[in-house]
């Protein structure tokens, strides 16, 4: 019987228009000049010459069996089909699909519709409803053929399928005989221009055009024999007595003899009740005796179609074409029976039993058969096109499909079995697919590869990645045509035997357990261009292993030297990646790689770049040496004349050689996180430099030659002792370099912000430049009584260091107003104000007398007040002091004239200023000042606008409610103010939240407020809850592997975004309860109660409740020398430790936090590893264990057990995140890239 060989995926024809739907019909616009523009696997239709052609005829023909190979033309469709199954029969293959029809080609010939010659005769009447019906064509017959009665019918049942099966079984020898006979036919057919014969659409309407027939002759395919069975609307009655043919007709030859069978009703099997037409044509060159045979000797075409096309012209021209038929039938084809089984009911096939095979008994006819082109044609499927690919991916197959008949599958060049569950391959699986060129089987569960793979002599691409292979058979090395071999993400411990793989150009072996590379395995790879050995366990690459390699990747191999002299033989190497290998030094043999274009040796332990190596790499365009221990770049770096990009970040470089300035093609230079104190004086020679990154160094000034770097567009200077406004960009930097005195009169468009919280930390006087500065005190923690008590505090010494540098221009100062939240500032210790402050161009400046009053600290002066208006402020109290805003407009204006004599010339200068509308007392006494009006912060929300709903979460110090604010669903976090520390924690959390920029993986923050003895933080509301709930509540949805990887990517992206702030933000409380799930199944990071800025005075909290997502008390942190932050709780002994009562966070915390040491981004990375473990296992970390015990386990290096069946990529990431030393852990950016590559391998199929 037949065998199921898999599910089918198919699509649109390449190069043809998709069918369009008009008025309920599907129109085929590819049919031109009577031909359907389908292209076969190796052939197609040539519109210009009206002929068919074969591309690679040698590959189409089987010279041993004298037959043409078979092709299944399936492509992807825009229709969503389901449960379709491909069956393997005896001589013919056929497809049973519930929603769609297919075509099978036994010849590889172009699949033209064999019924109609003209486009106007070829139409489709039945529409495709809801993607559930088969559709096709019916022949248009003339009056002699009689009309076909259309009767309502019913679909096939199981008995009918058995009858169809029996028919093919009983006639398989006839099908084979026909195929062989047709292959021996060599004919030239001429068609009369007035003829409407439809002999398989191979005869041209033009008498002079024989191209089509000539091509058929070349391919040994005649164009006559045809048996058509229309089954799309097949109706079968279970009552055997009623299963009869309702209509027959016979067209005879020139003798005009009508067969008596026209009037008879013939049974087809015992189960068919349909309208059938049997057309028999008589050939004058054959005797009538040949027609007394009940067997059909030549059956070349089976057409399962709809009943919508009428074969109006087929019978009119029988006599006209008998001569043609005689000329074409040189192989004694005796009978042609054209059987049409037509009804109206669509076939609905959802069965799981053996395929339907038509059973029929055909009456003998006293006529001869005309031949048609030999191929099996299963309904007119617009979406089929010539394809060499069989796509059986994502079908949940557990076994490798068996292809029994070589003729059926020999034409396939590509078989895709990816994303199934195939565990093994039978030894004889490749016997009948020896012509296969590409076998794609990634993402299965294969444990081995059979030795019979050597039968695939023509294989060029083999993808067995993401399986469970432990070893590769030696026979694979006999695939001499193999060009690409993918074996990544397996469990290979040995390098595969390469044998005769002389044409191999790409070998991918990443994410395995390979420890050594034997020379004999690499020597045959003379054409190798790409070798990926990343994420293996190679200790030392054996010398002299490879030659003529273009790309080599050996990431994470712990090579400890990188293979020594092997690079000496890799003279054609263009790209070399040795990153993540813990290399102690660069092999000197790298100097032989004179053709190298890209070299990556980042994330190692290299301290020196050898001059000899660098000097020899003159063609190098990209050099990445970041995250090493390099102290100095070699002087020979100027030999890298082709260098475009240099990344030397995260080293300990203290000095750049002057020779670096001669890299004339350099465009990107990254020197972040080093110990540089200055740049070379000739840095301006880098005229093509576009991007310069200098973050976190010790550079105090830029050389004047920097102005020559006119191509530069991006520059990063944060974390250096440079003027604070350098972050404004290249314009401000260039201006400052040109004008050391920094007269910013021309920089009115720049509006730097002075954070008043930093004023107390200044060790040197700050300079207040004019031109639109304003003071931002939103983060200020000092002088809070000004904002809260309603009274001015006594003047302090906190601002005694403020200086106003001469000269200072403060013209045009309406750009930014004074922030009303700023505290009061004392002026009694201000140095004398320079005369240059008197500005003639400043209409809002003070008069000389007013300034003198300020200098002498008189009790009453007049000054501008840009913070308030005259109508909103109390008439007799000070609301704020502005020294640069001058935003209020006085009702009166005073004009003064100043006369100056210079070089004997008298110059007159006129100045205008606005007078102060009110006076205030600047003495230290506050007795006359009443309570100030309440100041509202920019982040503050009106409590009355909040509407509370139900409680959705509760912790030790806070509760979370669902509510509404300004018509938005929001989450409201309520924090009880138990003491001043609680208020400090609240202000710090709000300060961080207000700095966050919108990001898809961070919970949106709306604002906060204080009411009574509570503080409230308003954020986005996500009704799905936390990832913890999604993982551990049984009633919720079950997450598949792909979704879990997607969650991990979201968390990594969100954390990476936090690390990009300057200074970086550390969450320090990453856990699944603080990861909220959106309706689109994305993750957003929430709860910044423990979050901290790096390199600032920070507070952090160790939560004492494992069930809370909220804020607790905190411990103060201070900056450490290396930029990480140390948790400091001083106990009675003066030592630093973590509050031992708050250890719930220990379940996710990094060891350095538990050891009371510094924390950094890498601390969050450790927590991310635990989250990833929780995603993989669906278990709660350290569930039921005592926090103290967990703490000791983590500090001692013990970790949670990773399941054996865990994906290798995720396993490696988890292990890397759990490294005991924080510097050994990856960054979130590298984690994201690794996860993204894993996601691509899951969701995106490789197309070659």
Curated annotation (Swiss-Prot):
Region Disordered, residue ranges: 1-26, 40-61, 100-125, 180-220, 235-338, 825-873, 1106-1135
Q: Which PANTHER family match?
A: LRR RECEPTOR-LIKE SERINE/THREONINE-PROTEIN KINASE-RELATED, RECEPTOR PROTEIN-TYROSINE KINASE CEPR1
Active site, UniProt feature: 1069 (proton acceptor)
- Identify its protein family: Belongs to the protein kinase superfamily. TKL Ser/Thr protein kinase family.
A Gene Ontology molecular function term for this protein is: protein serine/threonine kinase activity
* EC nos: 2.7.11.1
**Organism source for this protein?**
Dictyostelium discoideum
Q: Name one Pfam family in it.
A: PK_Tyr_Ser-Thr
- Kindly provide the name given to this protein in its UniProt entry: Probable serine/threonine-protein kinase DDB_G0278509
Biased composition range(s): Polar residues:
102-117
- Biased composition annotated in UniProt, kind: Basic and acidic residues: 845-858
**Which stretches make up the Protein kinase domain?**
946-1239
Show the ranges annotated as biased composition (Low complexity): 181-216, 860-873
- Taken from the UniProt record, the cysteine pairs bridged by disulfide bonds within this chain are none
Would you say which domain of life the source belongs to?
Eukaryota
What InterPro entries does the record tag this protein with?
Kinase-like_dom_sf, Leu-rich_rpt, Leu-rich_rpt_4, Leu-rich_rpt_typical-subtyp, LRR_dom_sf, Plant_LRR-RLKs, Prot_kinase_dom, Protein_kinase_ATP_BS
UniProt keyword terms in alphabetical order: ATP-binding, Kinase, Leucine-rich repeat, Nucleotide-binding, Repeat, Serine/threonine-protein kinase, Transferase
Task: Give residue ranges of the LRR repeats.
Answer: 386-407, 411-432, 435-457, 458-480, 481-502, 503-524, 527-548, 572-593, 595-616, 619-641, 642-663, 665-687, 688-708
So what does this thing catalyse?
L-seryl-[protein] + ATP = O-phospho-L-seryl-[protein] + ADP + H(+); L-threonyl-[protein] + ATP = O-phospho-L-threonyl-[protein] + ADP + H(+)
Q: Which sites bind ATP?
A: 952-960, 973
């Amino acid at each position: 019987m037949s065998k199921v060989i898999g599910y089918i995926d198919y699509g649109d024809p390449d190069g043809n228009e998709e069918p369009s739907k008009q008025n309920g019909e599907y129109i085929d616009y590819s049919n031109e000049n009577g031909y359907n523009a389908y292209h076969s696997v190796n052939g197609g239709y040539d519109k210009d010459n009206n002929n068919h052609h074969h591309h690679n005829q040698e590959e189409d023909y089987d010279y041993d069996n004298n037959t043409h190979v078979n092709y299944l033309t399936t492509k992807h469709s825009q229709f969503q089909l389901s449960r379709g199954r491909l069956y393997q029969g005896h001589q013919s293959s056929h497809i049973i699909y519930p929603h769609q029809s297919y075509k099978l080609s036994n010849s590889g010939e172009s699949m033209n519709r064999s019924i109609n010659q003209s486009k106007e005769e070829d139409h489709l009447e039945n529409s495709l409803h809801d993607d559930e019906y088969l559709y096709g064509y019916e022949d248009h017959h003339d009056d002699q053929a009689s009309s076909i009665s259309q009767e309502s019918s019913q679909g096939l049942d199981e008995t009918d399928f058995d009858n169809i099966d029996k028919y093919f079984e009983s006639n398989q020898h006839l099908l084979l005989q026909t195929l062989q006979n047709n292959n021996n036919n060599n004919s030239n057919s001429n068609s009369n221009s007035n003829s409407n014969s439809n002999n398989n659409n191979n005869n041209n309407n033009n008498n002079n055009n024989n191209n089509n027939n000539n091509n058929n002759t070349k391919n040994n395919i005649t164009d006559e024999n045809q048996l058509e069975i229309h089954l799309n609307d097949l109706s079968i009655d279970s009552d055997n007595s009623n299963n009869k043919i309702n209509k027959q007709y016979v067209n005879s030859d020139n003798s005009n003899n009508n067969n008596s069978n026209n009037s008879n009703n013939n049974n087809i099997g015992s189960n068919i009740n349909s309208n059938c037409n049997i057309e028999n044509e008589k050939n004058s060159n054959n005797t009538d005796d040949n027609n007394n045979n009940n067997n059909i000797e030549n059956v070349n075409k089976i057409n399962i179609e709809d009943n919508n096309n009428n074969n109006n012209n087929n019978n009119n021209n029988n006599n006209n074409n008998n001569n043609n038929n005689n000329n074409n039938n040189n192989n004694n084809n005796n009978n042609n029976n054209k059987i049409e089984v037509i009804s109206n009911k669509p076939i609905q096939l959802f069965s799981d039993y053996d395929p339907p095979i038509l059973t029929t008994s055909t009456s003998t006819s006293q006529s001869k058969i005309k031949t048609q082109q030999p191929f099996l044609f299963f309904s007119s499927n617009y979406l089929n096109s010539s394809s060499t690919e069989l796509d059986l991916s994502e079908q949940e197959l557990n076994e490798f499909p068996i292809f029994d008949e070589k003729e059926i599958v020999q034409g396939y060049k590509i078989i895709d079995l990816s994303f199934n569950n195939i565990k093994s391959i039978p030894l004889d699986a490749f016997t009948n697919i020896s012509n296969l060129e590409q076998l794609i089987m990634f993402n299965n569960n294969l444990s081995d590869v059979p030795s019979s793979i050597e039968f695939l002599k023509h294989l060029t691409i083999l993808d067995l990645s993401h399986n469970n292979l432990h070893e590769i058979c030696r026979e694979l090395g006999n695939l001499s045509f193999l060009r690409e071999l993918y074996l990544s993400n397996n469990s290979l411990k040995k390098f595969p035997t390469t044998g005769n793989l002389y044409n191999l150009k790409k070998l991918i072996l990443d994410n395995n357990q390979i420890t050594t590379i034997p020379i004999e395995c690499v020597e045959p790879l003379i054409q190798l261009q790409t070798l990926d050995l990343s994420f293996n366990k190679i200790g030392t690459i054996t010398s002299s292993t490879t030659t003529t390699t273009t790309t080599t990747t050996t990431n994470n191999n712990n090579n400890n030297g990188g293979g020594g002299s092997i690079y000496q033989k890799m003279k054609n190497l263009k790209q070399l990646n040795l990153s993540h290998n813990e290399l102690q030094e660069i092999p000197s043999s790298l100097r032989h790689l004179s053709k190298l274009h890209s070299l990556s040796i980042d994330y190692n332990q290299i301290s020196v770049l050898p001059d000899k190596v660098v000097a020899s790499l003159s063609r190098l365009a990209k050099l990445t040496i970041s995250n090493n221990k390099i102290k100095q770049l070699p002087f020979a770096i100027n030999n890298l004349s082709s260098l475009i990009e240099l990344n030397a970040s995260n080293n300990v470089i203290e000095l750049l050689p002057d020779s670096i300035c001669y890299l004339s093609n350099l465009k990107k230079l990254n020197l972040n996180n080093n110990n540089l104190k200055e740049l070379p004086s000739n840095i301006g020679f880098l005229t093509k430099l576009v991007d310069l990154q200098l973050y976190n160094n010790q550079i105090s000034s830029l050389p004047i030659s920097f102005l020559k770097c006119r191509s530069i567009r991006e520059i990063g200077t944060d974390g250096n002792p440079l003027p604070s406004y350098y972050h404004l960009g290249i314009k401000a930097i260039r201006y400052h370099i040109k004008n050391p005195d920094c007269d910013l009169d021309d920089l009115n468009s720049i509006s730097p912000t002075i954070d008043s919280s930093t004023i107390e930390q200044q060790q040197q006087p700050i300079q207040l430049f004019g031109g639109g500065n304003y003071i931002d005190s939103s983060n200020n923690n000092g002088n809070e009584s000004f904002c809260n008590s309603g009274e001015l505090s006594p003047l302090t010494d906190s601002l005694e260091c403020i200086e106003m540098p001469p000269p200072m221009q403060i013209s045009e100062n309406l750009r930014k107003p004074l922030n009303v939240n700023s505290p009061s500032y004392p002026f009694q210790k201000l140095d004398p104000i320079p005369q240059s402050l008197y500005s003639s161009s400043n209409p809002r400046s003070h008069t000389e007398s007013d300034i003198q009053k300020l200098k002498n600290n008189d009790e009453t002066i007049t000054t501008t007040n840009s913070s308030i208006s005259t109508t909103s402020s109390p008439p007799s109290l000070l609301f704020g002091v502005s020294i640069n805003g001058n935003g209020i407009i006085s009702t009166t204006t005073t004009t003064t004239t100043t006369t100056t004599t210079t070089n004997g010339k008298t110059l007159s200068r006129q100045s205008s200023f606005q007078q102060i509308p009110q006076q205030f007392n600047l003495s230290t006494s506050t007795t006359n000042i009443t309570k100030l009006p309440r100041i509202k912060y920019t982040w503050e929300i009106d409590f009355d606008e909040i509407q509370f709903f139900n409680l959705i979460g509760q912790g030790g110090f806070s509760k979370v409610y669902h509510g509404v604010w300004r018509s938005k669903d929001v989450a409201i976090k309520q924090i009880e103010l138990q003491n001043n520390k609680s208020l400090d924690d609240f202000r710090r959390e709000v300060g961080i939240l207000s700095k966050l920029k919108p990001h898809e993986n961070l919970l949106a923050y709306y604002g906060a407020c204080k009411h009574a003895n509570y503080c409230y933080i308003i954020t986005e509301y996500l009704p799905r809850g936390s990832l913890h709930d999604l993982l551990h509540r049984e009633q919720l949805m079950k997450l598949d592997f792909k979704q879990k990887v997607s969650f991990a990517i979201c968390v990594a992206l969100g954390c990476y975004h936090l690390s990009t702030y300057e200074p970086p933000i550390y969450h320090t409380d990453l856990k699944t309860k603080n990861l909220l799930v959106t309706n689109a199944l994305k993750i957003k990071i929430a709860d910044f109660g423990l979050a901290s800025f790096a390199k600032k005075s920070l507070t952090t909290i160790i939560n004492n409740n494992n069930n809370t997502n909220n804020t607790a008390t905190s411990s103060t942190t201070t900056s450490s020398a290396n930029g990480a932050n140390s948790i400091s709780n001083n106990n009675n002994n003066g030592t630093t430790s973590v509050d031992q009562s708050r250890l719930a966070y220990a379940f996710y915390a990094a060891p350095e936090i538990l050891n009371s040491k510094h924390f950094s981004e890498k601390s969050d990375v450790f927590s991310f590893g635990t989250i990833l473990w929780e995603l993989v296992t669906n278990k709660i970390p350290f569930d039921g264990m005592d926090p103290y015990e967990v703490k000791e386990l983590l500090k001692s290096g013990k970790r949670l057990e990773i399941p054996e069946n865990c994906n290798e990529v995720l396993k490696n990431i988890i292990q890397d995140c759990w490294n005991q030393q924080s510097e050994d852990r990856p960054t979130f950016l590298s984690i994201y890239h690794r996860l993204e590559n894993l996601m691509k391998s899951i969701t995106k199929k490789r197309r070659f």
